[in-house]
């Protein structure tokens, strides 16, 4: 039985299927429709946002037998071969594994020859920032004035490492992190097609953990399918990722705000006795303080229903009413500092306890919340 991982199985094959990058898709589509096709394109942004996917669709659009179009037919031999990864005129390489100038010379050795089958020869170089200085120099010579039948598509997660001489010769497109709601909608659609049951709260947690990377979210979803035996629940996600429930995070925060020493000791015991990702505790506290700050300044704003339950929303509004903004900001800064120190501390448990103690002892006015 052949199994296809979800990220590959449901990879977008047309521009219309691309999630969360509408302005880039629109710009590329207009370029293709107008026939204003640049010889070098650069896509940059965090992992899992669609750089390579868009590059492959662009390669397909440029070489479709029905003509250059933002809507390739997906039926001709060129389109099919691009999707299968064996199109003879698409040279796709990972620069991380081919950093030497000799590798670049070998790749571009036949650049002067016409395409064997397609309209253009396309060089798709992923993680291009990993190339050596000499490789960049050799690439520059070819990217300055390439033959009419050559197109370069570069992708990177680290724009700062690419020489300005390369950047100045490319059309540059920044792919933004995917919106939480768009990730939830995409995962939900995939799970419906896969006949997998789920809880919407579980998908929200997965989306938050992915930090804007759709591929990370889909990969994490696949892990949760296995953990939950085909049923993705909030409980499974929280247990797997070491995440607290919202009432537990609220309990820790109100203990700090109330300056309740007895409950602080209980918090320490709970953190010690359970298998929790310590960083998640501070991340959740930071997110909660952020929401409280927003409600404090803009009371009319609507909280995210996907992330917070009605009870939690009520608690956030109550804290915002009773608190002082400067105090909340001080708690936020202290928690943020604790998060930065977490990975350099000799013991993360000690680090989280020290951060909570620091927050507990801040010179702030207690807020009594039941």
From Swiss-Prot:
Enzyme Commission code: 2.7.7.7
**Positions annotated to bind ATP:** 45-52
Catalytic activity, as annotated: DNA(n) + a 2'-deoxyribonucleoside 5'-triphosphate = DNA(n+1) + diphosphate
Q: Which GO terms describe its molecular function?
A: ATP binding; ATP hydrolysis activity; DNA binding; DNA-directed DNA polymerase activity; metal ion binding
What is the enzyme's class at the highest EC level? transferase
Keyword set for this entry?
Answer: ATP-binding, DNA replication, DNA-directed DNA polymerase, Metal-binding, Nucleotide-binding, Nucleotidyltransferase, Transferase, Zinc
> Where are the bilayer-spanning segments?
none
Kinase is among the record's keywords = no
- What's the domain of life for this entry? Bacteria
Q: Which GO terms describe its cellular component?
A: DNA polymerase III complex
Q: Which CDD domains match?
A: AAA, HLD_clamp_pol_III_gamma_tau
Recorded hits in Pfam families, A to Z, give:
DNA_pol3_delta2, DNA_pol3_gamma3, DNAX_ATPase_lid
- Protein's UniProt keywords contain Zinc: yes
Give the GO biological process terms: DNA-templated DNA replication
Signal peptide start-end = none
UniProt binding sites for Zn(2+): 64, 73, 76, 79
Quaternary assembly: DNA polymerase III contains a core (composed of alpha, epsilon and theta chains) that associates with a tau subunit. This core dimerizes to form the POLIII' complex. PolIII' associates with the gamma complex (composed of gamma, delta, delta', psi and chi chains) and with the beta chain to form the complete DNA polymerase III complex.
- Function of the molecule: DNA polymerase III is a complex, multichain enzyme responsible for most of the replicative synthesis in bacteria. This DNA polymerase also exhibits 3' to 5' exonuclease activity.
The record, for NCBIfam families, names:
dnaX_nterm, PRK14961.1
Q: Which family does it belong to?
A: Belongs to the DnaX/STICHEL family.
In Swiss-Prot or TrEMBL terms, this protein is called: DNA polymerase III subunit gamma
């Amino acid at each position: 039985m052949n199994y296809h991982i979800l990220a590959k199985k449901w990879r977008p094959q047309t521009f219309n299927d691309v999630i969360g990058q509408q302005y880039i898709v629109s710009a590329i589509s207009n370029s293709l429709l107008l026939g204003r096709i640049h010889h070098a394109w650069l896509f940059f942004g965090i992992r899992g946002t669609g750089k390579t996917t868009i590059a492959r669709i662009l390669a397909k659009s440029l070489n479709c037998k029905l003509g250059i179009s933002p809507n390739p037919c997906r039926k001709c031999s060129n389109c099919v071969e691009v999707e299968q990864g064996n199109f003879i005129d698409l040279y796709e390489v990972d620069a991380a594994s081919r950093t030497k100038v000799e590798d670049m010379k070998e790749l571009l050795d036949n650049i002067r020859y016409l395409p064997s089958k397609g309209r253009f020869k396309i060089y798709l170089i992923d993680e291009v920032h990993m190339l050596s200085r000499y490789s960049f120099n050799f690439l520059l010579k070819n990217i300055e004035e390439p033959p009419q039948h050559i197109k370069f598509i570069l992708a990177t997660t680290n724009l700062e490492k690419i020489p300005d001489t390369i950047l100045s010769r490319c059309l540059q497109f920044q792919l933004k992190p995917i919106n939480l709601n768009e990730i939830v909608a995409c995962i939900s659609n995939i799970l419906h097609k896969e006949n997998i049951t789920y809880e919407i709260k579980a998908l929200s947690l997965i989306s938050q953990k992915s930090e804007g990377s759709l591929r990370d979210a889909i990969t994490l979803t696949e892990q949760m399918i296995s953990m939950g035996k085909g049923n993705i629940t909030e409980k499974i996600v929280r247990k797997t990722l070491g995440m607290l429930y919202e009432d537990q995070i609220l309990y820790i925060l109100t203990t700090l705000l109330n300056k309740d020493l007895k409950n602080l000791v209980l918090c320490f015991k709970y953190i010690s006795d359970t298998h929790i990702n310590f960083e998640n505790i501070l991340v959740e506290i930071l997110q909660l303080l952020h929401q409280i700050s927003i409600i404090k300044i803009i009371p009319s704003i609507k909280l995210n229903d996907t992330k917070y339950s009605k009870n939690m929303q009520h608690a956030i509004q109550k804290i915002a009413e009773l608190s002082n903004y400067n105090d909340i900001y001080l708690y936020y800064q202290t928690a943020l500092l604790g998060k930065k120190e977490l990975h350099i501390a000799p013991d993360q448990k000690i680090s989280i306890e020290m951060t909570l103690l620091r927050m507990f002892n801040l010179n702030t006015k207690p807020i009594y919340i039941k």
